[in-house]
Curated annotation (Swiss-Prot):
Chain coiled-coil ranges: none
Described function: Site-specific tyrosine recombinase, which acts by catalyzing the cutting and rejoining of the recombining DNA molecules. The XerC-XerD complex is essential to convert dimers of the bacterial chromosome into monomers to permit their segregation at cell division. It also contributes to the segregational stability of plasmids.
Keyword Methyltransferase (UniProt): no
Cross-referenced PROSITE patterns: CB, TYR_RECOMBINASE
UniProt xrefs under PANTHER family: PHAGE INTEGRASE-RELATED (PTHR30349), TYROSINE RECOMBINASE XERC (PTHR30349:SF81)
Gene Ontology terms: biological process: cell division; chromosome segregation; DNA recombination; DNA transposition; resolution of DNA recombination intermediates
Keyword Signal attached: no
InterPro entries xref list: CB, DNA_brk_join_enz, Integrase-like_cat_sf, Integrase_catalytic, Integrase_recombinase_N, Integrase_SAM-like_N, Recomb_XerD, Tyrosine_recombinase_XerC/XerD
Cellular compartments annotated: Cytoplasm
Catalytic site: R147, K171, H242, R245, H268, Y277
Protein name as annotated: Tyrosine recombinase XerD
């Protein structure tokens, strides 16, 4: 059964051009699914998997304390995999059809207030190459709203400071052009002229943002730095790698930006994904009203 999972992972990597994070999620979910089938249900052939087996696996996830969102992701991975097996004629049926996970209320993204963003962006000290790099990364994330995975994949050739935009590749390697403001452009220019060469050392790399080995910085490396910077900035809120992306979208909408324009900048295929930020702005307005209105 492991061979078919390997074939599927190769397919999504080569033919569908999915991001590394998505591929890792697929592989992790399917290994967990396969292990449960073989060790708990004693199913050793994909042709013998039934709808009941999948439902039992989803119940196992729930009983293990997994969230509805996690179960939904596992089911999406399982569906894609069984569709692949059917298409490749490994199996003659898709047992995942018509299986639904329990609908869960979508949590509102956590965002920073403007003064918190400013504290965060002002924290990196421009006394070392790492300070210039961290400043440039944070300014870029807040200025563009791009995903952390998109930022770390940026090449030097993707940055067009004189024209005020960057080129990035989103989910499914979909290309998009995103404008950047003066503050971010200035921070990137300073990083490239004063710091990147020192981080590069004797290595050869076209990656824009480098680690201390002169190689492309990893998502985990950025996340570790972000937590450290947030602590220094005195930010008490729980942060995620997407916090600046969420703040970017929310602050744009609060200041009257068009929803479709924000959708395009974020690279959302479906505008309903972008609409979650309109709920965030309404919630924030209610909080302000309750806090400051004398008769709230």
């Amino acid at each position: 059964m492991k061979d078919q999972i390997k074939d599927f992972i190769h397919y999504v990597m080569v033919e569908r051009g999915l991001s590394q994070n998505t591929i890792v999620s697929y592989e992790r979910d399917l290994k967990s699914y396969s292990l449960y089938l073989t060790e708990t249900l004693h199913v050793t052939d994909w042709n013998h998997v039934t709808r009941i087996h999948i439902i039992q696996y989803l119940k196992h996830l729930k009983d293990s304390g997994k969230s509805g969102k996690t179960s939904a992701r596992h089911l999406a991975s399982i569906r894609s995999f069984h569709q692949f097996l059917l298409r490749e004629k490994v199996t003659d049926k898709d047992p995942s059809v018509h299986i639904e996970t329990q609908k869960t209320e979508r949590a509102l993204p956590k965002v920073l207030a403007l003064n918190e963003v400013e504290r965060l962006l002002d924290t990196p000290k421009l006394t070392s190459p790492f300070g210039y790099r961290d400043k440039a990364m944070l300014e870029l994330l807040y200025a563009t709203g791009i995903r952390v995975s998109e930022m770390i994949e940026l090449k030097t050739a993707d940055v067009h400071l004189s024209m005020g935009f960057i080129r990035c590749f989103g989910k499914g390697r979909k290309e998009r052009i995103v404008p950047i403001g003066e503050a971010a452009a200035s921070a990137i220019e300073e990083y490239m002229t004063k710091a990147r060469g020192k981080l590069l050392k004797n290595n050869v790399s076209d990656a824009l943002f480098l680690n201390h080995h002169g190689k492309q910085i990893s998502r985990q490396g950025f996340w570790k730095n972000l937590k450290k910077i947030a602590l220094e900035a005195g930010i008490k809120k729980e942060l995620t790698p997407h916090t600046l992306r969420h703040s970017f979208a929310t602050h744009l909408l609060e200041n009257g930006a068009d929803l479709r324009a924000v959708q395009e900048m974020l690279g959302h295929a479906d505008i309903s994904t972008t609409q979650i930020y309109t709920h965030v702005t309404k919630t924030r307005l209610k909080d302000v009203y309750k806090q400051f209105h004398p008769r709230a």
